[in-house]
Amino acid sequence: MNLNLDEESIRNIVRDVIGKMNGVQRAPSRPAEFQQSRGIFPDGASAAAAAREGYAQLCKGGIAARREVVDIVKSMTVSNAKEWGAFEYNETKIGRLEDKIGKLEIVKLVPGVEWIAPDAYSGDNGIMLEEYAPYGVIGAITPVTHSVPTIAGNIINMVAAGNAVVFNPHPGGVKSAVMAISAYNAEIERRLGIRNLICCVGNPTLESYEAIAKSGDVAIMCITGGPGVVKAAMKSGKKSICAGPGNPPVIVDETADPKKAACDIIAGGAFDNNLLCIGEKEIFVTEAAASAFMRELENNGAERISSAALDRLTSEVFEKKNGGYALRRALVGKDPQVLARAAGAEISPKTKMLFAETDANHPFVIEEQMMPMIPVVVVKNFEEAVRAAAKAERNYRHSAIIHSLDVTRMTEMARVLNTTLFVKNGPSTAGLGLGGEGYLSYSIATATGEGISNPKTFTRRRRCVMVGNLNIF
């Protein structure tokens, strides 16, 4: 996923994209001005109504049309990965350019129509067929952290299942969303004659979200975002598939290979400056493993900051609010060098991640901070590590990671934390099929229990029974 682009390559990509933004191919300052024939609408109600028409057209095209739409989205996303990744990086100003590009290049791994196969049973009393049928129009909320990747992944899953979709993207990534959705729709219309299969609000607001959620044209909602938007979706009155917040803990014990554990944690936690919801957010290491493990962190691209620097950074990142801590957004997804300067330190431009020793109640441990600064908590033993990890995970039931060669300990942590995603002896990204087995998705429905989404997530099971006939034996 990491392209290892050098600084000159990064500058060239950004310069090229900014030039296009300033020229005839630029995204407009008000995305709603895009032609509605490209699926971009000024409000939620009109976008939902148009998507309903797009759904009707898709139904006429059958599974072949679904398959072609999936192929269009995958091929366009991969072929435009450098330009679109740079566009999103320039718009959102968070994460790492090479990882923005990488997230788009791997969209081809998202499962499509091949996942939608019926189940059939035959017996003395006839036959039964169960099919995975579409809902119709799905309303989708997408985050600023992964604007185009989440949109592309959602489209692939949802259209493969036979649905249309209307997006209310995060305002911070709306230009990227509009650019990609407009391009997809143009190619879908050119090749299939289907219009408005993928719709989007060009000026997304709370009001446009509410209009989508309340629209009679929308059957279900799919939410990828923080606790606030998930809570709102739960009150919409519609079935909601919610990919909520996480704060993934890591346990490293004395049986683990310290170098491999350090390298894996850096690979997962530093990816896109730790914007991934599955990314390693806090580490609990046993006393017996601590020295060797932290030495390997330093040897492999992470840099330790002092307690004084940590205090200064903490004051920049968090504010006390309602008896707890609230995250200030200014440093979310920023490079470790930016974080170091905020902490009053200077570090190598090659540094991938910062780390600091903290106690288990430090705000960097308890709050999901989404930046490449990982707190390391030294604990007496594995039992203490599990208790602390469970507290830090906050019952989000999202993701957790362990580095250990003790299978009993792996099992204990998995049972206690009860997360949707649990990775053993690998980077967090292995949980989505990147260096591990399985399939890719950018929406992990933790809050509502569907898990890592795939086309079947967006279907309803329908049963058809024939009594006394058609069983041919």
Question: Positions of the model-derived regions?
Answer:
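Flexible, glycine/charged-enriched surface loops at secondary-structure junctions
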Residues: I63-R67, L192-I198, F271-C277, E303-L313, ...
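Conserved C-terminal structural/oligomerization subdomain of aldehyde/semialdehyde dehydrogenase
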Residues: A345-F473
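Structural signal for hydrophobic packing residues in well-ordered secondary-structure cores
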Residues: I18-Q25, R52-G62, V73-A81, G85-E88, ...
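Rossmann-like NAD(P) dinucleotide-binding subdomain of oxidoreductase/dehydrogenase enzymes
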Residues: P118-K260
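Terminal low-complexity tails and localization/encapsulation signals of metabolic enzymes
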Residues: N2-Q35, G126-G136, P336, V423, ...
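ALDH superfamily catalytic-core signature
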Residues: R38, A152, V230-M353, D359-A360
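N-terminal Rossmann-like NAD(P)+-binding subdomain of aldehyde/semialdehyde dehydrogenases
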Residues: N2-L129, N157, N299
